[in-house]
A protein has these predicted regions:
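Structural detector for short beta-strands of small beta-barrel domains
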Residues: 14-30
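Acidic/His-rich, divalent-metal-binding segments that scaffold phosphate/diphosphate chemistry
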Residues: 95-217, 240
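OB-fold single-stranded nucleic acid-binding module
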Residues: 25-35, 48-51, 55-99
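Divalent metal-dependent catalytic cores for phosphoryl transfer on phosphate-bearing substrates
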Residues: 153-155, 164, 175-293
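Short, acidic/hydrophobic/Gly-rich beta-strand patch recurrent on exposed beta strands
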Residues: 38-43
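Acidic, carboxylate-rich catalytic segments that either coordinate divalent cations
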Residues: 269-327
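OB-fold nucleic-acid-binding modules
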Residues: 1-16
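Divalent metal-coordination and catalytic microenvironments
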Residues: 20, 65, 169, 250, ...
């Protein structure tokens, strides 16, 4: 069945009936102590908060990653659409088309992966080349590497987003190494290809993007440090000092302690890679905000990832009338 009501199309004062994926569900209490149901619902176009104030006993059988059919009133709360649920039920399997609920990259993942492998094959450092090709040929990794999102919310938060992010970083690494020839481009490429490999185990993404228990307890930096260290140990003769450098770039790529890195970047390439990663991530979040139909003609909707809204520059600079020619 084709889904007709999408999150991106929700507008104030609508009464809607539609199918959504449950991202979160919890029972909270109002300030007066009265319980109410709060859910985060979503589809491939985005997520929306939903609340039900009375008679939500049926919710006890609803869990994260379930599909539900809801009837609701669309309200605006803090400048964002919110659903006031009237009723809901579990959706039937034949009512659901998974493609409506899984946002995915606009690029062909096989083309992206071939592009990344091309960067790996062109590396001059034999140890780093062997390392990345070994990791990217691991049957336990390669399929998930092509499918995984890069994050739950912050950036490239859709299927294939991780690979899209990696391919973009590889291109940026080569460009910046051309401008700054003192940089070791193979180290930057290694970081680009392996810096988020821990997200394959940090995130689950069969229906909605969420965190695994391992992801919540360890985080992707710890997971990928173990994965990549194990791969280096399996390569006979891998230089110990080079192993330390790779490990440092991986654990420092978030750039600051408060963002999850246990060490600040203390190698030139580690610092550069942190900024490349941060720039690509933030621009992806800006792109997503500007691409959304919500917001105003000249302004995007508020971006939770970046804590602001963005000016639609082309619309702002558009000439309302062409300038008159002067004689």
């Amino acid at each position: 069945m084709t889904k007709s009501t999408m999150v991106r199309d929700l507008a104030a004062d609508q009464t809607i009936t539609g199918y959504f994926l449950v991202h979160e569900k919890e029972v909270r209490n109002t300030s007066s102590g009265k319980p109410y149901l709060r859910m985060e619902l979503g589809d491939s176009s985005g997520t929306v908060e939903a609340r039900m104030w009375d008679q939500f006993e049926a919710a006890k059988d609803v869990h994260r990653d379930d599909f539900v059919k809801v009837s609701a009133r669309v309200e605006i709360y803090r400048n964002k659409p919110q659903l006031s649920l009237l009723q809901f039920r579990m959706a039937k399997p034949e009512e659901i088309n998974l493609a409506d609920f899984l946002p995915h990259t606009a690029y062909d993942v096989e083309v992206l992966f071939k592009e990344v492998l091309g960067h790996a094959e062109g590396m001059k450092n034999p140890w780093l080349k062997k390392l990345v090709l070994q990791v990217l040929s691991d049957p336990q990794i390669v399929g998930r590497y092509k499918r995984a999102p890069a994050a739950k919310v912050m950036h490239h938060a859709y299927l294939g987003g991780l690979l899209e992010h990696v391919a973009g970083l590889c291109g940026l690494a080569k460009q910046i190494a051309t401008h700054y020839p003192e940089l070791d481009v193979d180290l930057l490429l290694t970081a680009a290809m392996l810096h988020d490999v821990g997200k394959l185990d940090e995130l689950c993404y069969e229906r909605a993007v969420s965190y695994t228990t391992e992801g919540q307890l360890l985080g992707h930096i710890v997971i990928e440090l173990e994965t990549v260290s194990r791969a280096m140990d399996e390569i006979e003769g891998f230089p110990a000092n080079l192993k330390t450098v790779v490990q440092h770039i991986l654990i420092s790529h978030h750039g600051q302690y408060e963002f999850g890195s246990p060490k600040l970047p203390m190698i030139r390439e580690a610092l550069v890679f942190h900024y490349l990663d941060d720039m690509d991530s933030k621009l992806a979040a800006v792109r997503a905000a500007l691409a959304s139909d919500s917001g105003e003609p000249e302004w995007s909707a508020y971006s939770g990832a970046l804590g602001r809204k963005f000016l639609r520059l082309e619309e702002f600079l558009k000439e309302k009338e062409p300038p008159k020619e002067t004689k």
